[in-house]
Amino acid sequence: MIKQPIPDLSPFYYWENFNYVLGYVKKQYQNLLSDSEITFIQDFENLPKESQCLYLRLASRRALWFREEKLTYVEISNISLSLDELGEKGFIRFASTQDSINLGSILSVFSKKECVALASKLAHFPKYSSNISKYDLVDLCKPFGIEILQEMNKIS
């Protein structure tokens, strides 16, 4: 059997594919779309291309929270600007002290070492064993949600 060469993909292949499907849905199923779905499509199409790309990249990842410094996509020249545009248009939101209820999922994007560093900044944080698991450390952090999030905002 002769192996076929793998075609070179455009750096924006996922964006091109998404827009192809989106165009098809708009053409074939416009009458089935809700007002909120139509608004989403219009708002998405009004975003700059790089912001659309970043949104698609984030939407295809498993996690709910992401650290900006961990986002690297060669086809997106200014991730910070794209994040700001996505935030301004309501496509994403940034962690705030109001997210203390979600602290466990937010801390999941940090390493155990980073969680220890955040916890160590709190004077009244309880003592814990050095061999504590990250999961247990995150549980210890939950009652200090707002303070932990404030510390996170200082380092981000």
Named regions from a protein language model:
Residues 2-45, 53, 57-156:
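Basic helix-extension-helix modules of the SAP/HeH family
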